[in-house]
Amino acid sequence: MGAMFFGLMLFTLGWTLIDGSESEQDFMWHVRKIPRLVSERTFHLTSPAFEADAKMVLNRVCGIECQKDLPAPSLSDLEDSLSYETVFENGSRTLTRVKVQGWVPEPTQNLTSQGAPVRRKRQVYGTDSRFSILDKKFLTNFPFNTAVKLSTGCSGILISPNHVLTAAHCVHDGNGYIKGSKKLRVGLLKMRNKGGGKRRRGSRRNRREVSGAGREGSQDSLKETAKAGRRRKGSARRQRAADGRPSFQWTRVKNTHIPKGWARGESRDPALDYDYALLELKRPHKKKYMELGVSPTIKKLPGGMIHFSGFDQDRADQLVYRFCSVSDESNDLLYQYCDAESGSTGSGVYLRLKEPDKKRWKRKIIAIYSGHQWVDVHGVQKDYNVAVRITPLKYAQICLWMHGDDANCTQG
């Protein structure tokens, strides 16, 4: 299975690079100047209730045609949407207002496909082309090791030793923070030790209890009980490994950042363009992570293909990888027919391109998978699995969240 999957990966990469209409320049990361986001003022807000229900599907999302008819957002509108809420581990919450400097408006992207009849709601299109990553050689190595699972049921991706990028709706429904996000945890993939791992040393209290029990009962009965317990635990671990289900190391989230473009409250519906959030981990990890990149246009995608991995709920905690071509785009969204189920939302969408002036290739995150949505295209409803593009402004915002200033956010 592992060899076949590796061969398929090589074939896919080669297939995306053989189109004679594409030049070598099209397969490079183009360094772009990033506008500055400056924190202007921070306000303390009331602590959230964490009572909202998770909302995975938004009805009648403003699609490409709809966005094309809207006036271009003003600088004030952008600054309002890019201002952000931060929720801390102790339940406190703040709102930070930002100023944008050096922003150059981008031209509106053209529609890349023609109108189509209304489609039946679905998240897997035709033959299911997803691949479960079962081989440990792939599962715990880059790029698959960058995928993480959220305790709220979504996926995410490691973008630094301390940060995870995910979809905003995984923690906030646009009006309030969802149930389960108060004590949010992130599960990182880890290797299973042979034989189920090392046995932890018991606490001093547990050792005292065992000592007391030993005085009341025979040492032989205690040994038999301990052996039986270890056999049961070892059997459960081996069964999970045989099923291809990964093991997780769970880490608490220290704070969460969400743009105001999503967390609009009761006054307006959340904007799908801002369905992304950054989670700061309480403890850093030592795994290889994936860097951010600015999303290129469809014409600059090798073969028009994107890739992402997540924990689809219909595959029992297996890590699922998929790749597909992008159908349409707007300035902020990518519309595609990648096969995916709930649980994979929040996954990092990435590309593998060549670095400028270097011979090596590098993967970078260019979008966040938002899930299955209905969008208005040419006056009809079309269903797409949608990803939120990382634009220069969003790159600057996420970088500001990570570093606290714009010192490392000038180019992307």
Curated annotation (Swiss-Prot):
Keywords: Disulfide bond, Glycoprotein, Secreted, Serine protease homolog, Signal. Residues 217-227 have a biased composition (Basic and acidic residues). Disulfide bonds join 154-170. Residues 192-246 are annotated as: Disordered. It is found in: Secreted. Residues 124-407 form the Peptidase S1 domain. Residues 192-207, 228-239 have a biased composition (Basic residues). InterPro entries: Glutamyl_endopeptidase, Peptidase_S1_PA, Peptidase_S1_PA_chymotrypsin, Trypsin_dom, TRYPSIN_HIS. Gene3D superfamilies: Trypsin-like serine proteases (2.40.10.10). Pfam families: Trypsin. GO terms for cellular component: extracellular region. Residues 1-23 form the signal peptide. It comes from the Eukaryota. Glycans are attached at residue 110. PANTHER family: INACTIVE SERINE PROTEASE 35 (PTHR15462:SF17), SERINE PROTEASE (PTHR15462). Belongs to the peptidase S1 family. This is Inactive serine protease 35.
